[in-house]
């Protein structure tokens, strides 16, 4: 038997190998023995760890001038991002892109709510009138998840406050037709505070009152805002919050189309304080989008333009040349999208990200992986291929902060979710030229051709729990790879220090759960 080498020579022996273990990104993407790749087709090989996960920075650039503390973006879909989603995305270090399947005035109002948001103050609470009933309160509790509702004379914000009703007032009340005035806490028994109070003082006042809600009123006793003890406890510290450097307001983006009336829409959004505009199209390489990019850069030079969607170098070059500051990558890869099936057009998402990012990185352009993101692993793979951010639609659709009501089936809570190419979205606003038809170039079609589906997704709870889980998961993944930041990850991939491995179908099965008769997959 031949003698083994001394263990002290292991590192020297390793140097004799001509190539590092695994594949470089060039080997992975530019091979000629396999078609396009998606996330489950490969893995990232582990590196060397000499730091703890908490030391990993996820700071990233989503566009030429916007840097965030996390790479998270919410998709401009009407069942994903409105003002509540955008507020909490920004508080947690990401940014929300408010959909445009609504009137320009409604969209601008949502942008304004995000910009005016101050942690803890609820500026658009649900408000009831004295004519509402106990049944109405119970319905709000079931569909919205809360029941502390102020009562005003006209049932609107800035109406004269007459009382407040909470879950304690109605939980044992059997007659659902009873007016809320018979069970509510009347105005004279309420503790309120005056408009203009600082959050710190209001917080202290709410704590001392030992109440769950604190109404904020003006000099005429009209309701102007509401404070919630639960929200205040959640909102005390957001160290990652995405804020502008000058005004310290939360950052927000919004989507528009490429029609002439979208220029009027953008004027309202800019007036509301928009930080970035996303030109929303399934196929971005069009004369319409190029013309729109040039017009925006000339008219609103301080607003970053995120263009797309693209999946090829040629598309990418066209939009960069027009002036795009960031690009969305993906065509037909979204969970609610059937473009590849119906149109036979698109590209596997991993290959699309790698090809676009390789070209766009030469120009300092943000690259946003948009579609196909189902878990933390997919995010890590997107970022390792050159993406600087990930956009989530279906992954966020079931959260508390997404628009829409809850549905309960067989004891499980769901929320509605639909692709913007679905028939439901195309017909949802009752307006022929809505955001969905514009996105898929079908405004003038007599017959609709769906490129998406609609349905229900399981309730995921609050973004306040879900996004920190994603953030921590990414930190641990980068630790396994051996890189301390996203910039370091991209640099290590470019230098071929980070290595990859293709997976066979059997290898994919091996990486899945095996051997259990039953199991619970609890992620956080």
Swiss-Prot record:
<dbReference type="Pfam" id="PF00571">
    <property type="entry name" value="CBS"/>
</dbReference>
<feature type="binding site" description="in other chain">
    <location>
        <position position="337"/>
    </location>
    <ligand>
        <name>K(+)</name>
    </ligand>
</feature>
<feature type="active site" description="Proton acceptor">
    <location>
        <position position="439"/>
    </location>
</feature>
<keyword id="KW-0963">Cytoplasm</keyword>
<feature type="binding site">
    <location>
        <begin position="370"/>
        <end position="372"/>
    </location>
    <ligand>
        <name>IMP</name>
    </ligand>
</feature>
<keyword id="KW-0520">NAD</keyword>
<dbReference type="GO" id="GO:0003938">
    <property type="term" value="F:IMP dehydrogenase activity"/>
</dbReference>
<dbReference type="GO" id="GO:0000166">
    <property type="term" value="F:nucleotide binding"/>
</dbReference>
<keyword id="KW-0677">Repeat</keyword>
<feature type="binding site">
    <location>
        <begin position="417"/>
        <end position="421"/>
    </location>
    <ligand>
        <name>IMP</name>
    </ligand>
</feature>
<feature type="binding site">
    <location>
        <begin position="280"/>
        <end position="282"/>
    </location>
    <ligand>
        <name>NAD(+)</name>
    </ligand>
</feature>
<feature type="binding site" description="in other chain">
    <location>
        <position position="334"/>
    </location>
    <ligand>
        <name>K(+)</name>
    </ligand>
</feature>
<dbReference type="InterPro" id="IPR046342">
    <property type="entry name" value="CBS_dom_sf"/>
</dbReference>
<keyword id="KW-0630">Potassium</keyword>
<feature type="active site" description="Thioimidate intermediate">
    <location>
        <position position="337"/>
    </location>
</feature>
<dbReference type="InterPro" id="IPR005990">
    <property type="entry name" value="IMP_DH"/>
</dbReference>
<protein>
    <recommendedName>
        <fullName>Inosine-5'-monophosphate dehydrogenase</fullName>
        <ecNumber>1.1.1.205</ecNumber>
    </recommendedName>
</protein>
<keyword id="KW-0560">Oxidoreductase</keyword>
<dbReference type="GO" id="GO:0046872">
    <property type="term" value="F:metal ion binding"/>
</dbReference>
<dbReference type="GO" id="GO:0006177">
    <property type="term" value="P:GMP biosynthetic process"/>
</dbReference>
<feature type="binding site">
    <location>
        <position position="510"/>
    </location>
    <ligand>
        <name>K(+)</name>
    </ligand>
</feature>
<comment type="function">
    <text>Catalyzes the conversion of inosine 5'-phosphate (IMP) to xanthosine 5'-phosphate (XMP), the first committed and rate-limiting step in the de novo synthesis of guanine nucleotides, and therefore plays an important role in the regulation of cell growth.</text>
</comment>
<feature type="binding site">
    <location>
        <position position="335"/>
    </location>
    <ligand>
        <name>IMP</name>
    </ligand>
</feature>
<keyword id="KW-0658">Purine biosynthesis</keyword>
<feature type="domain" description="CBS 1">
    <location>
        <begin position="121"/>
        <end position="180"/>
    </location>
</feature>
<dbReference type="InterPro" id="IPR001093">
    <property type="entry name" value="IMP_DH_GMPRt"/>
</dbReference>
<dbReference type="GO" id="GO:0005737">
    <property type="term" value="C:cytoplasm"/>
</dbReference>
<dbReference type="InterPro" id="IPR000644">
    <property type="entry name" value="CBS_dom"/>
</dbReference>
<keyword id="KW-0129">CBS domain</keyword>
<dbReference type="GO" id="GO:0006183">
    <property type="term" value="P:GTP biosynthetic process"/>
</dbReference>
<feature type="binding site">
    <location>
        <begin position="330"/>
        <end position="332"/>
    </location>
    <ligand>
        <name>NAD(+)</name>
    </ligand>
</feature>
<keyword id="KW-0332">GMP biosynthesis</keyword>
<dbReference type="Pfam" id="PF00478">
    <property type="entry name" value="IMPDH"/>
</dbReference>
<dbReference type="GO" id="GO:0005829">
    <property type="term" value="C:cytosol"/>
</dbReference>
<keyword id="KW-0479">Metal-binding</keyword>
<feature type="domain" description="CBS 2">
    <location>
        <begin position="184"/>
        <end position="242"/>
    </location>
</feature>
<feature type="binding site" description="in other chain">
    <location>
        <position position="332"/>
    </location>
    <ligand>
        <name>K(+)</name>
    </ligand>
</feature>
<feature type="binding site">
    <location>
        <position position="451"/>
    </location>
    <ligand>
        <name>IMP</name>
    </ligand>
</feature>
<dbReference type="InterPro" id="IPR013785">
    <property type="entry name" value="Aldolase_TIM"/>
</dbReference>
<dbReference type="InterPro" id="IPR015875">
    <property type="entry name" value="IMP_DH/GMP_Rdtase_CS"/>
</dbReference>
<comment type="pathway">
    <text>Purine metabolism; XMP biosynthesis via de novo pathway; XMP from IMP: step 1/1.</text>
</comment>
<comment type="similarity">
    <text>Belongs to the IMPDH/GMPR family.</text>
</comment>
